[in-house]
Protein backbone atom coordinates (compact mmCIF):
# COMPACT_ATOMS: atom_id res chain seq x y z
CA UNK A 1 0.00 0.00 0.00
CA UNK A 2 1.50 3.30 -1.11
CA UNK A 3 1.43 6.49 0.96
CA UNK A 4 1.57 9.96 -0.55
CA UNK A 5 4.74 11.84 0.35
CA UNK A 6 4.77 15.63 0.38
CA UNK A 7 6.60 17.12 -2.56
CA UNK A 8 9.67 19.11 -1.65
CA UNK A 9 9.85 22.75 -2.76
CA UNK A 10 12.35 23.27 -5.55
CA UNK A 11 15.13 25.83 -5.01
CA UNK A 12 13.74 27.94 -7.84
CA UNK A 13 10.27 28.03 -6.25
CA UNK A 14 11.77 28.93 -2.87
CA UNK A 15 13.70 31.84 -4.41
CA UNK A 16 10.56 33.04 -6.16
CA UNK A 17 8.56 32.89 -2.92
CA UNK A 18 11.24 34.88 -1.05
CA UNK A 19 11.27 37.53 -3.76
CA UNK A 20 7.50 37.89 -3.56
CA UNK A 21 7.68 38.23 0.22
CA UNK A 22 10.40 40.89 0.00
CA UNK A 23 8.43 42.75 -2.67
CA UNK A 24 5.32 42.73 -0.45
CA UNK A 25 7.32 44.11 2.47
CA UNK A 26 8.84 46.85 0.32
CA UNK A 27 5.47 47.81 -1.14
CA UNK A 28 3.73 47.92 2.26
CA UNK A 29 2.81 51.34 3.63
CA UNK A 30 5.56 52.42 6.04
CA UNK A 31 3.59 55.31 7.54
CA UNK A 32 2.54 53.52 10.78
CA UNK A 33 6.09 52.33 11.41
CA UNK A 34 7.49 55.78 10.67
CA UNK A 35 5.01 57.36 13.08
CA UNK A 36 6.01 54.99 15.88
CA UNK A 37 9.70 55.65 15.28
CA UNK A 38 9.12 59.40 15.23
CA UNK A 39 7.10 59.07 18.45
CA UNK A 40 10.22 57.69 20.12
CA UNK A 41 12.23 60.63 18.77
CA UNK A 42 9.59 63.09 20.00
CA UNK A 43 9.47 61.49 23.45
CA UNK A 44 13.25 61.62 23.77
CA UNK A 45 13.45 65.27 22.76
CA UNK A 46 10.54 66.24 25.02
CA UNK A 47 12.12 64.45 27.97
CA UNK A 48 15.42 66.26 27.43
CA UNK A 49 13.62 69.61 27.06
CA UNK A 50 11.63 68.99 30.25
CA UNK A 51 14.78 68.12 32.19
CA UNK A 52 16.54 71.24 30.87
CA UNK A 53 13.53 73.37 31.79
CA UNK A 54 13.34 71.89 35.29
CA UNK A 55 17.07 72.36 35.89
CA UNK A 56 16.92 75.90 34.52
CA UNK A 57 14.07 76.90 36.82
CA UNK A 58 15.87 75.41 39.83
CA UNK A 59 19.11 77.21 38.90
CA UNK A 60 17.38 80.58 38.55
CA UNK A 61 15.57 80.14 41.85
CA UNK A 62 18.84 79.29 43.59
CA UNK A 63 20.56 82.31 42.04
CA UNK A 64 17.71 84.56 43.09
CA UNK A 65 17.78 83.33 46.67
CA UNK A 66 21.57 83.54 46.69
CA UNK A 67 21.38 87.22 45.77
CA UNK A 68 19.27 87.84 48.87
CA UNK A 69 21.94 86.41 51.17
CA UNK A 70 24.23 89.37 50.49
CA UNK A 71 21.58 91.81 51.74
CA UNK A 72 20.48 89.84 54.81
CA UNK A 73 21.80 92.50 57.23
CA UNK A 74 19.68 95.28 55.72
CA UNK A 75 15.99 94.33 55.90
CA UNK A 76 14.59 97.17 53.72
CA UNK A 77 17.25 96.48 51.10
CA UNK A 78 16.50 92.76 51.34
CA UNK A 79 12.81 93.32 50.56
CA UNK A 80 13.71 95.66 47.70
CA UNK A 81 16.10 93.15 46.14
CA UNK A 82 13.56 90.34 46.60
CA UNK A 83 10.95 92.40 44.76
CA UNK A 84 13.26 93.54 41.97
CA UNK A 85 14.82 90.14 41.23
CA UNK A 86 11.45 88.47 40.76
CA UNK A 87 9.99 91.48 38.93
CA UNK A 88 12.81 91.56 36.36
CA UNK A 89 12.57 87.82 35.70
CA UNK A 90 8.79 88.02 35.35
CA UNK A 91 8.98 91.04 33.03
CA UNK A 92 11.42 89.13 30.84
CA UNK A 93 8.92 86.28 30.48
CA UNK A 94 5.94 88.57 29.85
CA UNK A 95 7.88 90.60 27.26
CA UNK A 96 8.96 87.53 25.28
CA UNK A 97 5.41 86.23 25.14
CA UNK A 98 3.72 89.50 24.27
CA UNK A 99 6.34 90.57 21.72
CA UNK A 100 7.15 87.36 19.87
CA UNK A 101 4.55 84.62 20.53
CA UNK A 102 1.27 85.57 22.24
CA UNK A 103 0.06 81.99 21.90
CA UNK A 104 2.84 80.95 24.31
CA UNK A 105 1.13 82.81 27.16
CA UNK A 106 -0.77 81.03 29.89
CA UNK A 107 -0.83 77.27 30.26
CA UNK A 108 -0.52 76.35 26.60
CA UNK A 109 -2.70 73.27 27.02
CA UNK A 110 -5.76 74.95 25.41
CA UNK A 111 -3.51 75.84 22.46
CA UNK A 112 -2.63 72.17 21.99
CA UNK A 113 -6.30 71.20 22.24
CA UNK A 114 -7.14 73.80 19.61
CA UNK A 115 -4.34 72.55 17.37
CA UNK A 116 -5.63 68.98 17.62
CA UNK A 117 -8.97 70.29 16.33
CA UNK A 118 -7.22 72.20 13.51
CA UNK A 119 -8.46 75.47 15.00
CA UNK A 120 -5.16 76.89 16.28
CA UNK A 121 -1.86 77.17 14.41
CA UNK A 122 1.34 75.52 15.65
CA UNK A 123 4.28 77.87 15.04
CA UNK A 124 6.95 75.80 16.76
CA UNK A 125 9.86 77.94 15.53
CA UNK A 126 8.70 80.82 17.72
CA UNK A 127 6.73 79.08 20.47
CA UNK A 128 9.55 76.75 21.54
CA UNK A 129 12.13 79.43 22.47
CA UNK A 130 9.54 81.85 23.86
CA UNK A 131 7.78 79.25 26.02
CA UNK A 132 11.06 77.80 27.26
CA UNK A 133 12.85 81.02 28.18
CA UNK A 134 9.69 82.91 29.11
CA UNK A 135 8.70 80.08 31.44
CA UNK A 136 12.18 80.13 32.95
CA UNK A 137 11.65 83.80 33.78
CA UNK A 138 8.24 83.50 35.39
CA UNK A 139 8.79 80.23 37.25
CA UNK A 140 12.35 81.14 38.15
CA UNK A 141 11.01 84.37 39.61
CA UNK A 142 8.88 82.42 42.07
CA UNK A 143 5.48 83.04 40.52
CA UNK A 144 2.61 80.73 41.46
CA UNK A 145 2.69 78.65 38.29
CA UNK A 146 3.36 75.05 37.31
CA UNK A 147 5.90 73.58 34.94
CA UNK A 148 3.42 71.21 33.28
CA UNK A 149 1.87 73.92 31.08
CA UNK A 150 5.17 74.82 29.44
CA UNK A 151 6.28 71.20 29.06
CA UNK A 152 2.96 70.14 27.49
CA UNK A 153 3.01 73.00 24.99
CA UNK A 154 6.72 72.53 24.33
CA UNK A 155 6.07 68.81 23.84
CA UNK A 156 3.26 69.37 21.36
CA UNK A 157 5.37 71.84 19.40
CA UNK A 158 8.32 69.44 19.37
CA UNK A 159 5.97 66.85 17.88
CA UNK A 160 5.05 69.26 15.11
CA UNK A 161 8.71 70.22 14.62
CA UNK A 162 9.72 66.58 14.11
CA UNK A 163 6.82 66.15 11.68
CA UNK A 164 7.99 69.12 9.60
CA UNK A 165 11.69 68.26 9.69
CA UNK A 166 11.16 64.67 8.55
CA UNK A 167 8.35 65.71 6.19
CA UNK A 168 5.81 63.17 7.29
CA UNK A 169 2.56 63.52 5.38
CA UNK A 170 -1.03 63.00 6.41
CA UNK A 171 -3.39 64.11 9.11
CA UNK A 172 -2.80 60.95 11.14
CA UNK A 173 0.92 61.63 11.52
CA UNK A 174 0.38 65.31 12.35
CA UNK A 175 -2.32 64.63 14.91
CA UNK A 176 -0.54 61.67 16.49
CA UNK A 177 2.84 63.35 16.97
CA UNK A 178 1.20 66.47 18.39
CA UNK A 179 -0.68 64.39 20.96
CA UNK A 180 2.40 62.28 21.66
CA UNK A 181 4.47 65.35 22.45
CA UNK A 182 1.82 66.74 24.77
CA UNK A 183 1.50 63.46 26.70
CA UNK A 184 5.26 63.13 26.93
CA UNK A 185 5.48 66.68 28.28
CA UNK A 186 3.09 66.00 31.15
CA UNK A 187 4.76 62.68 31.95
CA UNK A 188 8.19 64.29 32.13
CA UNK A 189 6.95 67.25 34.18
CA UNK A 190 5.68 65.04 37.00
CA UNK A 191 7.60 61.78 36.46
CA UNK A 192 4.17 60.24 35.92
CA UNK A 193 4.00 58.19 32.70
CA UNK A 194 0.53 56.72 33.24
CA UNK A 195 -0.90 60.16 34.05
CA UNK A 196 0.58 61.46 30.80
CA UNK A 197 -1.25 58.77 28.83
CA UNK A 198 -4.53 59.31 30.69
CA UNK A 199 -4.22 63.07 30.23
CA UNK A 200 -4.47 62.68 26.46
CA UNK A 201 -7.21 60.05 26.60
CA UNK A 202 -9.34 61.81 29.24
CA UNK A 203 -8.66 65.56 29.24
CA UNK A 204 -8.23 65.80 25.45
CA UNK A 205 -10.86 63.16 24.66
CA UNK A 206 -12.88 65.48 22.36
CA UNK A 207 -9.77 66.20 20.30
CA UNK A 208 -7.75 62.97 20.47
CA UNK A 209 -8.37 60.55 17.59
CA UNK A 210 -8.08 57.15 19.21
CA UNK A 211 -6.54 54.58 16.87
CA UNK A 212 -4.17 51.68 17.39
CA UNK A 213 -1.34 53.71 15.89
CA UNK A 214 -2.03 56.89 17.84
CA UNK A 215 -2.29 55.19 21.24
CA UNK A 216 0.85 53.13 20.59
CA UNK A 217 2.68 56.30 19.62
CA UNK A 218 1.55 58.02 22.83
CA UNK A 219 2.77 55.04 24.85
CA UNK A 220 6.16 55.09 23.15
CA UNK A 221 6.58 58.85 23.52
CA UNK A 222 5.65 58.76 27.21
CA UNK A 223 8.03 55.87 27.86
CA UNK A 224 10.94 57.68 26.23
CA UNK A 225 10.29 61.01 27.95
CA UNK A 226 10.03 59.33 31.35
CA UNK A 227 13.26 57.43 30.74
CA UNK A 228 15.00 60.70 29.90
CA UNK A 229 13.65 62.28 33.08
CA UNK A 230 14.79 59.38 35.25
CA UNK A 231 18.25 59.29 33.71
CA UNK A 232 18.89 62.80 35.02
CA UNK A 233 16.84 62.52 38.22
CA UNK A 234 16.17 59.97 40.93
CA UNK A 235 13.73 57.15 40.27
CA UNK A 236 11.65 58.03 43.31
CA UNK A 237 8.32 59.73 43.88
CA UNK A 238 8.40 63.40 42.94
CA UNK A 239 6.79 64.44 46.25
CA UNK A 240 7.96 62.64 49.38
CA UNK A 241 5.11 62.50 51.89
CA UNK A 242 6.03 59.12 53.34
CA UNK A 243 3.75 56.11 53.58
CA UNK A 244 0.38 57.11 54.98
CA UNK A 245 -2.12 54.82 56.65
CA UNK A 246 -4.98 53.30 54.70
CA UNK A 247 -8.54 54.63 55.01
CA UNK A 248 -10.89 52.23 56.87
CA UNK A 249 -14.14 51.42 55.10
CA UNK A 250 -16.26 53.12 57.77
CA UNK A 251 -14.51 56.44 57.05
CA UNK A 252 -15.05 56.54 53.28
CA UNK A 253 -18.16 58.72 53.64
CA UNK A 254 -15.90 61.52 54.88
CA UNK A 255 -14.03 61.45 51.56
CA UNK A 256 -17.32 61.81 49.71
CA UNK A 257 -18.06 64.94 51.76
CA UNK A 258 -14.59 66.23 50.89
CA UNK A 259 -15.34 65.60 47.21
CA UNK A 260 -18.60 67.54 47.51
CA UNK A 261 -16.69 70.51 48.95
CA UNK A 262 -14.30 70.46 46.00
CA UNK A 263 -17.22 69.98 43.61
CA UNK A 264 -18.65 73.26 44.87
CA UNK A 265 -15.33 75.11 44.90
CA UNK A 266 -14.07 73.92 41.49
CA UNK A 267 -16.62 75.74 39.26
CA UNK A 268 -16.33 78.84 41.47
CA UNK A 269 -12.57 78.76 41.03
CA UNK A 270 -12.98 78.51 37.25
CA UNK A 271 -15.26 81.56 37.25
CA UNK A 272 -12.71 83.47 39.29
CA UNK A 273 -9.98 82.60 36.77
CA UNK A 274 -12.04 83.85 33.83
CA UNK A 275 -13.18 86.93 35.76
CA UNK A 276 -9.60 87.77 36.72
CA UNK A 277 -8.59 87.43 33.06
CA UNK A 278 -11.19 90.06 32.15
CA UNK A 279 -10.13 92.34 35.00
CA UNK A 280 -6.42 92.20 34.19
CA UNK A 281 -7.13 92.72 30.49
CA UNK A 282 -8.93 95.93 31.38
CA UNK A 283 -5.86 96.99 33.35
CA UNK A 284 -3.34 96.64 30.51
CA UNK A 285 -5.80 97.06 27.61
CA UNK A 286 -3.56 95.10 25.26
CA UNK A 287 -0.72 97.63 25.61
CA UNK A 288 2.59 95.76 25.77
CA UNK A 289 4.24 98.24 28.15
CA UNK A 290 1.37 98.17 30.63
CA UNK A 291 1.15 94.41 30.32
CA UNK A 292 4.85 93.88 31.07
CA UNK A 293 4.80 96.35 33.97
CA UNK A 294 1.72 94.66 35.41
CA UNK A 295 3.46 91.30 35.11
CA UNK A 296 6.52 92.72 36.83
CA UNK A 297 4.38 93.95 39.72
CA UNK A 298 2.76 90.53 40.11
CA UNK A 299 6.14 88.80 39.90
CA UNK A 300 7.65 91.21 42.41
CA UNK A 301 4.77 90.53 44.81
CA UNK A 302 5.45 86.80 44.55
CA UNK A 303 9.13 87.47 45.23
CA UNK A 304 8.25 89.35 48.41
CA UNK A 305 5.87 86.62 49.52
CA UNK A 306 8.53 84.02 48.83
CA UNK A 307 10.72 85.72 51.42
CA UNK A 308 8.08 86.75 53.96
CA UNK A 309 5.72 83.74 53.66
CA UNK A 310 7.35 81.05 51.46
CA UNK A 311 4.29 78.77 51.61
CA UNK A 312 2.24 81.31 49.64
CA UNK A 313 4.47 81.55 46.55
CA UNK A 314 6.04 79.22 44.01
CA UNK A 315 4.50 76.22 42.28
CA UNK A 316 3.69 74.48 45.55
CA UNK A 317 5.74 71.28 45.41
CA UNK A 318 7.69 72.29 48.52
CA UNK A 319 4.46 73.12 50.35
CA UNK A 320 2.70 69.79 49.77
CA UNK A 321 4.85 67.51 52.00
CA UNK A 322 4.94 70.13 54.78
CA UNK A 323 1.16 70.51 54.78
CA UNK A 324 0.60 66.76 54.54
CA UNK A 325 2.83 66.19 57.57
CA UNK A 326 0.56 68.45 59.65
CA UNK A 327 3.13 71.17 60.30
CA UNK A 328 0.61 74.02 59.97
CA UNK A 329 -2.09 75.15 62.36
CA UNK A 330 -5.67 75.54 61.16
CA UNK A 331 -5.33 79.32 61.08
CA UNK A 332 -2.14 79.08 59.03
CA UNK A 333 -3.77 76.66 56.58
CA UNK A 334 -6.65 79.08 56.03
CA UNK A 335 -4.19 81.94 55.46
CA UNK A 336 -2.11 79.89 53.01
CA UNK A 337 -5.21 78.76 51.13
CA UNK A 338 -6.63 82.28 50.74
CA UNK A 339 -3.24 83.75 49.83
CA UNK A 340 -2.50 81.06 47.26
CA UNK A 341 -5.95 81.37 45.68
CA UNK A 342 -5.26 85.09 45.14
CA UNK A 343 -1.71 84.61 43.85
CA UNK A 344 -2.77 81.72 41.60
CA UNK A 345 -5.51 83.85 40.06
CA UNK A 346 -3.16 86.80 39.56
CA UNK A 347 -0.31 84.80 38.06
CA UNK A 348 -2.26 82.44 35.81
CA UNK A 349 -4.92 84.88 34.64
CA UNK A 350 -2.35 87.52 33.70
CA UNK A 351 -1.14 85.43 30.76
CA UNK A 352 2.23 84.51 32.23
CA UNK A 353 3.83 81.47 30.57
CA UNK A 354 3.15 78.75 33.13
CA UNK A 355 0.68 76.06 34.10
CA UNK A 356 -1.97 75.73 36.77
CA UNK A 357 -1.73 71.99 37.57
CA UNK A 358 0.84 72.39 40.35
CA UNK A 359 -0.88 75.39 42.02
CA UNK A 360 -4.19 73.49 42.01
CA UNK A 361 -2.51 70.43 43.51
CA UNK A 362 -1.15 72.63 46.30
CA UNK A 363 -4.55 74.24 46.91
CA UNK A 364 -6.19 70.82 47.05
CA UNK A 365 -3.59 69.63 49.54
CA UNK A 366 -4.08 72.60 51.85
CA UNK A 367 -7.88 72.38 51.79
CA UNK A 368 -7.76 68.60 52.20
CA UNK A 369 -5.42 68.92 55.19
CA UNK A 370 -7.72 71.47 56.83
CA UNK A 371 -10.70 69.17 56.32
CA UNK A 372 -8.71 66.26 57.72
CA UNK A 373 -7.78 68.21 60.85
CA UNK A 374 -11.45 68.99 61.46
CA UNK A 375 -12.39 65.33 60.89
CA UNK A 376 -9.70 64.17 63.33
CA UNK A 377 -11.15 66.41 66.04
CA UNK A 378 -14.79 65.51 65.37
CA UNK A 379 -14.32 61.74 65.02
CA UNK A 380 -11.54 60.59 67.36
CA UNK A 381 -12.99 57.06 67.36
CA UNK A 382 -11.90 56.60 63.74
CA UNK A 383 -8.20 57.24 64.48
CA UNK A 384 -7.94 59.34 61.33
CA UNK A 385 -4.80 60.79 59.76
CA UNK A 386 -5.15 64.27 58.26
CA UNK A 387 -2.51 63.47 55.65
CA UNK A 388 -4.79 60.96 53.92
CA UNK A 389 -7.32 63.73 53.28
CA UNK A 390 -4.50 65.92 51.96
CA UNK A 391 -3.61 63.27 49.36
CA UNK A 392 -7.28 62.80 48.44
CA UNK A 393 -7.69 66.55 48.09
CA UNK A 394 -4.65 66.95 45.83
CA UNK A 395 -6.38 65.55 42.80
CA UNK A 396 -9.92 66.58 43.73
CA UNK A 397 -9.62 70.25 42.73
CA UNK A 398 -8.02 69.14 39.48
CA UNK A 399 -10.95 66.79 38.90
CA UNK A 400 -13.55 69.47 39.64
CA UNK A 401 -11.85 72.21 37.62
CA UNK A 402 -10.72 70.48 34.42
CA UNK A 403 -13.08 67.45 34.74
CA UNK A 404 -10.32 64.86 34.49
CA UNK A 405 -10.70 62.73 37.64
CA UNK A 406 -8.70 59.72 36.40
CA UNK A 407 -5.76 61.91 35.43
CA UNK A 408 -5.84 63.65 38.80
CA UNK A 409 -6.02 60.39 40.75
CA UNK A 410 -3.24 58.61 38.88
CA UNK A 411 -1.07 61.73 38.82
CA UNK A 412 -1.21 62.06 42.61
CA UNK A 413 -0.61 58.34 43.15
CA UNK A 414 2.46 58.37 40.90
CA UNK A 415 3.79 61.55 42.48
CA UNK A 416 3.35 60.45 46.11
CA UNK A 417 3.66 56.64 45.86
CA UNK A 418 0.67 56.08 48.16
CA UNK A 419 -1.27 53.57 46.07
CA UNK A 420 -3.12 52.22 49.11
CA UNK A 421 -5.24 55.40 49.07
CA UNK A 422 -6.68 54.78 45.61
CA UNK A 423 -10.20 53.98 46.88
CA UNK A 424 -10.70 57.18 48.94
CA UNK A 425 -9.15 59.15 46.09
CA UNK A 426 -11.63 57.68 43.60
CA UNK A 427 -14.52 58.53 45.91
CA UNK A 428 -13.28 62.10 46.43
CA UNK A 429 -12.53 62.67 42.75
CA UNK A 430 -15.82 61.20 41.56
CA UNK A 431 -17.82 63.26 44.06
CA UNK A 432 -16.00 66.42 43.02
CA UNK A 433 -16.45 65.77 39.29
CA UNK A 434 -20.13 64.84 39.46
CA UNK A 435 -21.12 67.83 41.57
CA UNK A 436 -19.05 70.20 39.42
CA UNK A 437 -20.77 68.81 36.33
CA UNK A 438 -24.24 69.17 37.86
CA UNK A 439 -23.61 72.78 38.92
CA UNK A 440 -22.80 73.73 35.32
CA UNK A 441 -19.96 75.60 33.75
CA UNK A 442 -17.33 74.41 31.31
CA UNK A 443 -14.08 72.71 32.25
CA UNK A 444 -11.36 75.32 32.67
CA UNK A 445 -9.28 74.50 29.59
CA UNK A 446 -12.37 74.25 27.38
CA UNK A 447 -13.56 77.66 28.57
CA UNK A 448 -10.15 79.23 27.91
CA UNK A 449 -9.99 77.65 24.43
CA UNK A 450 -13.49 78.95 23.62
CA UNK A 451 -12.37 82.46 24.57
CA UNK A 452 -9.25 82.16 22.44
CA UNK A 453 -11.23 80.97 19.42
CA UNK A 454 -13.79 83.76 19.85
CA UNK A 455 -10.98 86.32 19.95
CA UNK A 456 -9.36 84.73 16.89
CA UNK A 457 -12.65 84.86 14.98
CA UNK A 458 -13.16 88.52 15.93
CA UNK A 459 -9.65 89.40 14.74
CA UNK A 460 -10.17 87.58 11.44
CA UNK A 461 -13.48 89.36 10.92
CA UNK A 462 -11.88 92.73 11.64
CA UNK A 463 -9.07 92.01 9.15
CA UNK A 464 -11.53 90.95 6.46
CA UNK A 465 -13.58 94.12 6.98
CA UNK A 466 -10.44 96.24 6.79
CA UNK A 467 -9.37 94.48 3.59
CA UNK A 468 -12.81 95.00 2.05
CA UNK A 469 -12.74 98.67 2.98
CA UNK A 470 -9.31 99.16 1.42
CA UNK A 471 -10.44 97.44 -1.80
CA UNK A 472 -13.50 99.68 -2.02
CA UNK A 473 -11.37 102.79 -1.66
From Swiss-Prot:
Q: What GO molecular function annotations does the UniProt record carry, in alphabetical order?
A: chloride:proton antiporter activity; identical protein binding; voltage-gated chloride channel activity
Alphabetically list the UniProt keywords.
Answer: Antiport, Cell inner membrane, Cell membrane, Chloride, Ion transport, Membrane, Stress response, Transmembrane, Transmembrane helix, Transport
GO terms for cellular component: plasma membrane
On induction, the UniProt comment says:
By acid-shock conditions.
Q: Where is this site: Mediates proton transfer from the outer aqueous phase to the interior of the protein?
A: 148
**Renumbered ranges of motif Selectivity filter part_3:** 355-359
Topology: which residues are Periplasmic?
70-76, 233-252, 310-329, 377-386
Q: Give the result of residue 445 to A, as annotated.
A: Abolishes gating, permitting continuous rapid transit of chloride ions
Q: How does it sit in the membrane?
A: Multi-pass membrane protein
User: Any ranges marked Cytoplasmic in the topology annotation, and which?
Assistant: 1-32, 117-123, 167-176, 202-214, 282-287, 439-473
Please report the name of this protein according to its UniProt entry. H(+)/Cl(-) exchange transporter ClcA
Native organism is Escherichia coli (strain K12)
Gene this protein is translated from: clcA
